[in-house]
């Protein structure tokens, strides 16, 4: 759930970077409950049952008792608890400085992977312990990362411990080689946030300057959504950072585009951050003058044109910053939106009647927004020459927009403006919206019959389908050429249940799937604990193979043993084995069919876990089902129990249950892999389960994306896909009396989507056959 919330918040750039608990605080509150009743204050504090006396005394800063224990048992100093914490971690978390000093003197291990004691001190802002560890030269490697890929430097910056951040930087700069130091400076976390970006988000200009000037931080570093430090500064209205970053990064940084197709000034416009917009314009003027050696009014027009190329640029949706300023429906301060518009027009030279990709002006946008917010902006735009008679691509003016959105005050204001300006525009307020493509006349003709209009629309739709098909095949050939020539070196495949359907494992959500066949079942601890028989019966029915009579050489070797890998599985393996371009296969499947094709395990990440591993939820004993004991027990209708004599609880597969986070491998690898990806292939997944579904947007905006699936989904969907889906649904209901998600249509659809995507819609294996046939045809 946390990962889903983070992905939802990307657009607003509310970065959830603060650790969800301070490590020291967590121990106190987990192990020492609040005492609200007087009698409880006399009770001894509670600690984890696993904690030895050494851990307890270390936590409580009991120097003499700790010394006594480690003198008797020297090896106990490096013992760890279930969190992999040593007595040093525990002492640091509670700021037990005397015990920390003692343990450091006794050569306790300081480089335990993930959170080191140094990480904890940096996170908690404990300057004394940081200084003590530095003075004693007992500091771990600066590039040791936490579970979320955070360095100690990153954690100190995240929590605004500037003095500690300075000391950490200074220490490692003198003790590391330059390459290792640079690696630490630019190390991003699992969300792609670097120390520089975090310093911007924390509005710490001193740290920004120190990272860049002393650490040579990469000013072009970007988050998971491709937002740079300048994007972030624009969003939080950090004008001092904007000025400084632009001085260094220049126009190249200003033109950087994030996942949403926005430059930094687009983001400032969305927020109505007029101060940031003003700073952008002022700094850009200085940069343009400097770059073009302009020294007078003779170059003023050139300067303005160069400026407009940057501040009037359209985003992915065809909107300029001015349009975005006017889309103020969610604005908390409409005055800021008005000031932003004034800055863009009066100081940036943006045209008041400039149009977006839909031929709409800023006034069109305002006419759609509730008049309680947009009325002051409408008055301003009319006062400086905005034309309310310009028609958008549907033939509507701002007057039509206001009328049909029931913004009566704006509607009347626009009508009054027509009278005042003696406009000759002939207003037909009942005019219907009619899409006017670039190939048709912009003038509307009321004499056109409805039949001819319908015919034109139909032929236009057919033309679009044919164009999309031709463009899709052309793009597919380009992808194939790229694979043949070795141009694609880091291909990522996202695969789902659809690629295993032809192996006899139906996707969960179809009429033959696991969820439909057993309404009581869910992948949840609640079902496993309360109804283990229901849980394992569903697992047995869905995953355990129906083994037919076979010869002596065949053997039931566990899950899906009688099920063979599909053409889609072998296609993924070919990317690795034949073409050497597979970087990683991220799969939602918990079956081992991909491994059976010969794909190396290090090339596969099971995002939702795998049935290869099992464990006991009580004693935590791990099981690898090499001997097939677990599946044989499930296959005969029994329950798999823990083999520990004192435990004997029902064990569970190492798959992700509802509400559980995805694996550490998934979180760490995705951020690094998707930055390298040069081709993304999506196969057999509905892209509705997050955070897996969000991965499709994590490749760079110029990376081709190829979808093999029964139907278009996620960002690949267009309006024609919706029409096809509705038509197929009606057809299936007419034939069987019920709706189905199964693919009864043998026809493959190959089409282009957007400016980079290709879809091959239909059965995944047939899509692979088509790909391979085309591959071998030239």
Swiss-Prot record:
Entry EC no(s): 2.3.1.286
Gene Ontology terms for molecular function: metal ion binding; NAD+ binding; NAD-dependent protein lysine deacetylase activity
Domain of life of the organism encoding this protein: Eukaryota
Binding site for Zn(2+): 616, 619, 642, 647
SUPFAM superfamilies attached to this UniProt entry: Ankyrin repeat, DHS-like NAD/FAD-binding domain
The keyword Transmembrane belongs to this UniProt entry's keyword annotation: no
Residue ranges annotated for the Deacetylase sirtuin-type domain, each copy included: 465-778
ANK repeat start and end residues: 83-112, 114-142, 148-178, 191-221, 225-255, 260-289, 317-354, 358-390, 394-423
Region (Disordered): 438-458, 727-746
Bias (Low complexity) ranges: 733-746
Cofactor comment: Binds 1 zinc ion per subunit.
Cofactor(s) in the UniProt record: Zn(2+)
ATP-binding in keyword set: no
Catalysed reaction equations from the record: N(6)-acetyl-L-lysyl-[protein] + NAD(+) + H2O = 2''-O-acetyl-ADP-D-ribose + nicotinamide + L-lysyl-[protein]
PROSITE patterns according to UniProt: ANK_REP_REGION (PS50297), ANK_REPEAT (PS50088), SIRTUIN (PS50305)
Database matches in Gene3D superfamilies: Ankyrin repeat-containing domain, SIR2/SIRT2 'Small Domain, TPP-binding domain
Residues of the active site: 608
Keywords: ANK repeat, Metal-binding, NAD, Repeat, Transferase, Zinc
Family: Belongs to the sirtuin family.
Function per UniProt: NAD-dependent deacetylase, which plays an important role in the regulation of transcriptional repression.
Name of this chain's protein: NAD-dependent deacetylase sir2B
Organism expressing this protein natively: Dictyostelium discoideum (Social amoeba)
Source organism phylogeny: Eukaryota, Amoebozoa, Evosea, Eumycetozoa, Dictyostelia
UniProt gene name: sir2B
């Amino acid at each position: 759930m946390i990962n889903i919330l983070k992905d939802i918040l990307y657009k607003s750039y509310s970065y959830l970077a603060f650790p969800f608990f301070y490590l020291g605080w967590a121990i106190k509150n987990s192990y020492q409950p609040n005492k609200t009743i007087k009698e409880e204050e006399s009770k001894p504090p509670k600690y984890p049952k696993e904690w030895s006396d050494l851990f307890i005394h270390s936590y409580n800063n009991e120097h003499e008792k700790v010394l006594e224990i480690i003198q008797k048992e020297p090896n106990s100093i490096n013992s760890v608890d279930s969190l992999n914490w040593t007595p040093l971690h525990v002492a640091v978390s509670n700021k037990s400085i005397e015990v920390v000093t003692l343990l450091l003197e006794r050569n306790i291990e300081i480089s335990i992977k993930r959170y080191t004691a140094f990480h904890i001190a940096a996170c908690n802002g404990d300057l004394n312990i940081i200084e003590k560890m530095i003075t004693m030269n007992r500091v771990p490697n600066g590039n040791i990362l936490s579970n979320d890929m955070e360095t100690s430097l990153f954690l100190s910056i995240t929590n605004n411990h500037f003095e500690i951040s300075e000391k950490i930087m200074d220490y490692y700069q003198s003790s590391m080689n330059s390459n290792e130091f640079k690696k630490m400076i630019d190390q991003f976390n699992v969300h792609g946030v670097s120390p520089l970006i975090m310093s911007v988000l924390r509005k710490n200009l001193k740290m920004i300057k120190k990272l860049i000037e002393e650490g040579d931080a990469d000013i072009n570093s970007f988050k998971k959504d491709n937002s740079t430090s300048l994007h972030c500064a624009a969003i939080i209205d950090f004008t001092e950072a904007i000025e400084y970053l632009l001085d260094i990064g220049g126009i190249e940084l200003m033109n950087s585009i994030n996942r949403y197709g926005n430059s930094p000034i687009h983001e400032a416009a969305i927020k109505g951050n007029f101060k940031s917009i003003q700073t952008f314009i002022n700094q850009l003027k200085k940069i343009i003058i400097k770059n073009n050696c302009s020294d007078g009014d003779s170059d003023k027009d050139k300067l303005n044109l160069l400026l407009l190329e940057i501040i009037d640029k359209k985003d992915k949706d065809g909107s300029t910053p001015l349009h975005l300023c006017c889309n103020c429906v969610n604005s908390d301060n409409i005055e800021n939106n008005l000031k932003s518009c004034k800055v863009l027009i009066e100081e940036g030279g943006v045209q008041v009647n400039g149009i977006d990709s839909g031929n709409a002006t800023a006034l069109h946008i305002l006419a759609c927004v509730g008049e309680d917010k947009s009325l002051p902006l409408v008055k301003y735009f009319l006062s400086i020459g905005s034309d309310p008679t310009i028609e958008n691509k549907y033939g509507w003016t701002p007057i039509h927009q206001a009328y049909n959105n029931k913004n009566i005050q704006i509607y009347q204001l626009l009508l009054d403006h027509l009278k005042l300006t003696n406009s000759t525009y002939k207003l037909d307020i009942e005019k219907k919206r009619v899409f006017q493509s670039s190939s048709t006349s912009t003038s509307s003709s009321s004499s056109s019959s409805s039949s001819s209009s319908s015919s034109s629309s139909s032929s236009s739709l057919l033309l679009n389908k044919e164009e999309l098909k031709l463009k899709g095949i052309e793009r597919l050939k380009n992808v194939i050429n790229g694979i043949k020539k070795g141009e694609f070196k880091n291909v990522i495949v996202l695969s789902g249940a659809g690629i295993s359907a032809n192996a006899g494992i139906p996707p969960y959500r179809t009429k033959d799937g696991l969820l439909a066949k057993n309404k009581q079942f869910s992948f949840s601890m609640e079902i496993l604990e309360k109804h283990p028989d229901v849980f394992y019966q569903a697992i047995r029915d869905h995953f355990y193979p129906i083994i037919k009579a076979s010869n002596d050489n065949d053997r039931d070797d566990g899950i899906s043993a009688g099920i063979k890998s599909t053409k889609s599985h072998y296609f993924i393996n070919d990317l690795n084995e034949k073409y050497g371009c597979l970087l990683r296969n991220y799969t939602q499947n918990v079956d081992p069919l991909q491994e059976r094709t010969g794909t190396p395990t290090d090339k596969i990440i099971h995002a939702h876990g795998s049935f290869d591993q099992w464990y006991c939820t009580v004693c935590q004993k791990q099981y690898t089902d090499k001997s097939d004991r677990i599946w044989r027990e499930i296959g005969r209708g029994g329950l798999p129990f823990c083999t520990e004599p004192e435990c004997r609880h029902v064990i569970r597969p190492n798959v992700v249950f509802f509400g559980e986070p995805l694996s550490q491998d998934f979180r760490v690898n995705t951020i690094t892999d998707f930055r390298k990806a040069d081709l993304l292939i999506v196969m057999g997944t509905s892209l509705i389960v997050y955070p897996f579904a969000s991965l499709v947007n994590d490749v760079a905006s110029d990376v081709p994306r190829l979808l093999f699936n029964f139907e278009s989904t996620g960002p690949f969907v267009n309006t024609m896909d919706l029409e096809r889906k509705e038509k197929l649904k009606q057809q299936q209901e007419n034939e069987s009396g019920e709706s189905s998600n199964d693919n009864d249509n043998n026809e493959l659809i190959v089409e282009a989507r957007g400016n980079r995507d290709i879809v091959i819609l239909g059965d995944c294996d047939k899509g692979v056959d088509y790909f391979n046939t085309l591959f071998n045809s030239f």
